Swiss-Prot record:
Keywords: Cytoplasm, Methyltransferase, rRNA processing, S-adenosyl-L-methionine, Transferase. Specifically methylates the N4 position of cytidine in position 1402 (C1402) of 16S rRNA. Its EC number is 2.1.1.199. The keyword rRNA processing applies. Gene3D superfamilies: Putative methyltransferase TM0872, insert domain, Vaccinia Virus protein VP39. GO terms for biological process: rRNA base methylation. It comes from Pseudomonas paraeruginosa (strain DSM 24068 / PA7) (Pseudomonas aeruginosa (strain PA7)). This is Ribosomal RNA small subunit methyltransferase H. It catalyses: cytidine(1402) in 16S rRNA + S-adenosyl-L-methionine = N(4)-methylcytidine(1402) in 16S rRNA + S-adenosyl-L-homocysteine + H(+). One of its GO terms (cellular component) is cytoplasm.
Length: 313
């Protein structure tokens, strides 16, 4: 792989420590990426330990296969972590996993490689798919979606307040010629944005929304969290690193729901609530963020938030 696209793993030591790895434990890395967390975790495992990695990205799978060839304790699977439950059941591991790690979002190699089509800074084909062999590309969505749908994606997933204005500009321009390149789309969005945020590219939010939609990131996260909980053994750890407020909100609400049971929806004076609604998770500590040293070494870690929970039942 080109060194230009090197990935710096975020919250590396913190995430591995949060898993509280046992030498003979069984662990899942739901977002293998370039293997930073997996390699660090393998260093903590003994000869009886096992680690199963997941990723949709073909380039990540190549890296994972190389690691599997080096270390027989590791196996890589080309699946979304949303399908974690199916894989775990097929391997007879449901309820037997000691820790699950999810490091969400897009990796540096994906962002920095223009050919992947994620970046508004480097021109490339307008793709944005984590797995280029599955689903529709960003270009296909932009070419076919109604103006209202484009605006919804920008607003709901990108939290872009000028979503309608941007969608209108895109639909008007596509009547002349289709959008095929990231720079072309970024230029139209930038012109349509009347109020640029200081220190942020005017296309940032729209591109985030488009990427999340194309990859069904939030839907996959909800499915993956449910599957992770079922896969864990009692005492197993769930560690999730998110990079924007939409992801973090889903993670926070999921952990709180299972830490407090469903009792939040019932009257506080209901006498049987504590007996009927037993928590399945215990929240461990407060959300963790990158240290000052990590922020200096890797500015992309500035938005990272890590949450940790332990399975109770």
């Amino acid at each position: 792989m080109n060194a230009t696209y090197r990935h710096i793993t975020v919250l590396l030591e913190e995430a591995v420590s949060a898993l509280a790895p046992r030498e003979d434990g069984c662990y899942l890395d739901g977002t293998f990426g370039r293997g930073g967390h997996s390699r660090a975790l393998l260093e903590k495992l003994g000869t009886g330990g096992r680690l199963l990695g997941f990723d949709k990205d073909p380039q990540a799978i190549q890296t994972g296969k190389a690691l599997a060839a080096e270390d027989g304790r590791f196996v890589i699977v080309q699946r979304s972590f949303a399908e974690l439950g199916d894989e775990v059941r097929a391997r007879g591991l449901e309820g037997r996993v000691d820790g699950v790690l999810l490091d969400l979002g897009v990796s540096s190699p994906q962002l920095d490689d223009p050919e992947r089509g994620f970046s508004f800074l480097n021109d490339g084909p307008l793709d944005m798919r984590m797995n280029p062999g599955q689903g529709i590309s960003a270009a296909e969505f932009i070419a076919s979606a109604a103006e209202e749908e484009i605006a919804r994606v920008f607003k709901e997933y990108g939290e872009e307040r000028f979503a309608k204005r941007m969608a209108r500009a895109i639909v008007q321009r596509r009547q002349e010629r289709p959008f095929e390149r990231t720079a072309d789309l970024a230029e139209v969005i930038t012109v349509a944005n009347p109020a640029w945020e200081k220190g942020k590219n005017p296309a940032t939010r729209a591109f985030q929304g488009l990427r999340i939609h194309v990859n069904n990131e939030l839907g996959d996260l909800e499915r993956g969290l449910d599957a992770a909980l079922e896969s864990l053994a009692v005492g197993g750890r769930l560690v999730v690193i998110s990079f924007h407020s939409l992801e973090d909100r889903i993670v926070k609400l999921f952990m709180r729901k299972h830490a407090k049971g469903e009792a939040d929806n019932l009257p506080r004076d209901l006498p049987i609530r504590s007996k009927v609604f037993e928590p399945r998770l215990k929240l461990l500590g407060k959300p963790q963020y990158a240290s000052e040293a990590e922020l200096k070494a890797n500015p992309r870690s500035r938005s990272a938030v890590m949450r940790v929970a332990e399975k109770l039942k």
